[in-house]
Each structure stands twice: as structure tokens, then as C-alpha cells.
Regions:
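Flexible, acidic/Gly-rich N-terminal and inter-domain linker regions that tether
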Residues: 1-60, 64-68, 72-101
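Structured loops at beta-to-helix junctions and adjacent beta-edge loops in soluble globular domains
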Residues: 29, 59, 131, 301-303
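Short Gly/Ser/Thr- and Asp/Glu-enriched loop/turn motifs at secondary-structure junctions
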Residues: 51, 121-123, 292-296
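Short, acidic Gly/Pro/Ser/Thr-rich loop/turn segments
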Residues: 61-65, 185, 254, 307
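Glycine- and small hydrophobic-enriched segments that form the cores of compact globular domains
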Residues: 79-114, 121-127, 131
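Hydrophobic, Leu/Ile/Phe/Ala-enriched alpha-helical segments that form helix-helix packing faces
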Residues: 95, 99, 103, 207-210, ...
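Conserved AdoMet/S-adenosylmethionine-binding subsite of the radical SAM
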Residues: 107-263, 267-271, 275-276
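C-terminal accessory regions of radical SAM enzymes
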Residues: 270-313
């Protein structure tokens, strides 16, 4: 498909390009929070204020073509950024300005919480997870540093395919996620459709690396019914390598482009997520600490701590 046509489709879907390879998109939970119809599980679990969250990516390129991804995978088929590389401060400023423009559509909504809308003009949190693989952006440390200077927290999500980049990161995010989509190499290949030949070794190296990072770390399992909700002992062994502060066990949602590759039957119920989380708990030292039925997600920790929820006061 022509890339300009794909770009138009993405813009129609709510994406805004903030540079040559970076973009922003308002999260569904940000929209809901602005009209007081619920908040993201990250607000319940970690204290992130949904209406003040900016969902973005510094790089839309990705080494995987995950079958559960709701994003359109066709736009960037290269593992390198071609052309001009967006500057960190430009990305941040453009994300905020584009998000403000997108939020203006709420001004005519009679249910709009005006206090939240005013606060939303200046995000306090960046979810670096909207699309692509952030570690393909060469100035990721500088981006995180700029966010820190502005008093903005960051949750960074990686697929773990670039362990050397993780190792070389000299500015750590507030919270670092590694996606663990499968318990075995064979299942991973089926679900994530990696482009790199040594994908399993790369993932395992990343898991080992984050065990020593001095920041909040998370292993996230995206559970697809009938495909990867199995081999709990294998999952447990991988989790032990990473020794994360948190484990998120979240159900796959049948939305976006993933509907072309999966069936609604692949979307597990919250009860099934909780049951699977209990099985993971049996083989690890982690316990279910919290859950959110609407998001079909369970949070596991070795023990709950007072600093679980971030303080934004």
C-alpha cells in the first residue's frame, strides 16, 4: 500500500505525526477521563493521571509485526530511520501542541470536566508506547532527560529486541516495560513475527539486563486466548531472569488492525486473566496486588509498597 495513503489512514484514525518518524495519539482512557467516564488502569495501579497523559512514540519503526498489535504495521518497513532525525525537544513540544489541538474537539461536549481539560493542556506524563520500538530512536536518553527537566514522568515500553541499547541508556525512564508475549521461542515467533534472526536471544538478554536497572521495571504479558496462555512454568523462568518490580498480565483487546489477524474469541475474559495470573503466581514469588476488570488486567508484585503509586503533588 502507498505510504502516503497509509499516512492519511493513520491521521484519520487519530494519529498526528510530530516529525519525520514520531507521532502522538490520544488514548481512549484520556478521552474517558475528560468526561468522567473512567480512568486507565495505570491511574489505579500507579497514580498516573489519565487526563494528563500523552501517548506517543519517538519512532514508528519496529522489528516485530505482532499479530495482536492494533496499530497499522505497513507504514514503516525499515529498521533504520531514513532522512532527518527528529530532535528530542522538538518531539516533546510537537507532541504537546498536537495533543492540545486534538483535545480542542472536547470543548463542545457538555459533559467535559473543565478542570481536567485545563490541566490536560500541560501533560505530566508521557507513555512512550503508542507505536513502534522506542529504542530505534538514537536520542532516547536525551528525550528522557528533556522530559525529566520538564518534570514529566515517562513509562517506556520495549519489545526487548535491542538489549545493547537498553544497556547504553544513560537516562532511565520512570518505569521501563519489557513485553513478554510468549513463554517459548516457537510461540514467540508465531505471535510477534520478528524480523531479526536472533530474536529469542535478544529478548532473554534484555530480561537479564533489566534485573539490575535502577528504575521501576515491569514485565507485561499480553494474553491471547488459545495462543499464549500456556506454559506457566516457562513464563515463570523468564520472569525470574528479569526480577521486575511489577508484572502486568493483560488481556488482548480485539481492536484496530488486529481484527484482521485475530478473532474476537481470542480476547480473554477478565476472569480468565485472573485465573492465568494465579497460575503465574504459583510458580513465582509474586502475588496479585490489584486488578481492573474493565481493562482485563492484573498487577502482580512480590509485596505491595507505599511507592507503588507515584506522587504528583
Amino acid at each position: 500500500m502507498n505510504k502516503e495513503l497509509i499516512k492519511k489512514i493513520l491521521i484519520k484514525q487519530g494519529y498526528r505525526f510530530t516529525g519525520n518518524h514520531s507521532s502522538v495519539k490520544i488514548c481512549t482512557w484520556t478521552k474517558k477521563s475528560l468526561v468522567d467516564k473512567g480512568v486507565c488502569y495505570k491511574e489505579d495501579f500507579y497514580g498516573i493521571q489519565s487526563h494528563m497523559c500523552c501517548q506517543m512514540t519517538p519512532c514508528m519503526h519496529c522489528p516485530n509485526e505482532c499479530i495482536y498489535c492494533w496499530r497499522t504495521p505497513d507504514f514503516f518497513d525499515s529498521l533504520t530511520i531514513k532522512g532527518k532525525i527528529d530532535e528530542p525537544e522538538d518531539i516533546i513540544n510537537n507532541c504537546i501542541s498536537n495533543q492540545r489541538d486534538l483535545l480542542n474537539g472536547f470543548l463542545g461536549n457538555p459533559k467535559l470536566n473543565k478542570k481536567k481539560f485545563k490541566e490536560a493542556q500541560n501533560p505530566k506524563h508521557f507513555a512512550i508506547s503508542e507505536s513502534g520500538e522506542p529504542f530505534l530512536y538514537p536520542y532516547l536518553s536525551e528525550l528522557i532527560n528533556e522530559l525529566n527537566k520538564k518534570g514529566i514522568t515517562s513509562f517506556l515500553v520495549t519489545n526487548g529486541q535491542f538489549p545493547k541499547n537498553i544497556e547504553n541508556l544513560n537516562k532511565l525512564p520512570t518505569q521501563l516495560y519489557v513485553s513478554l508475549d510468549a513463554p517459548t521461542k516457537e510461540i514467540y515467533k508465531k505471535i510477534d513475527k520478528p524480523k531479526l534472526k536472533d530474536y529469542w536471544e535478544r529478548l532473554n538478554s534484555s530480561l537479564e539486563l533489566i534485573s539490575n536497572l535502577k528504575t521501576r521495571t515491569v514485565i507485561r504479558l499480553t494474553c491471547i486466548k488459545g495462543l499464549n496462555m500456556c506454559n506457566e512454568k516457562d513464563y515463570a523462568n523468564l520472569i525470574k531472569k528479569a526480577n521486575p518490580k511489577f508484572i502486568e498480565i493483560k488481556g488482548y483487546m480485539w481492536v484496530g488492525s488486529s481484527r484482521e489477524r485475530l478473532d474476537i474469541k481470542n480476547m480473554p475474559l477478565h476472569a480468565e486473566i485472573k485465573e492465568f495470573a494465579e497460575q503465574i503466581s504459583k510458580f513465582t514469588k509474586y502475588k496479585i496486588i490489584d486488578e481492573k476488570k474493565e481493562s482485563r488486567v492484573a498487577l502482580l508484585m512480590k509485596k505491595d509498597t507505599e511507592d507503588r503509586k507515584l506522587n504528583f503533588n
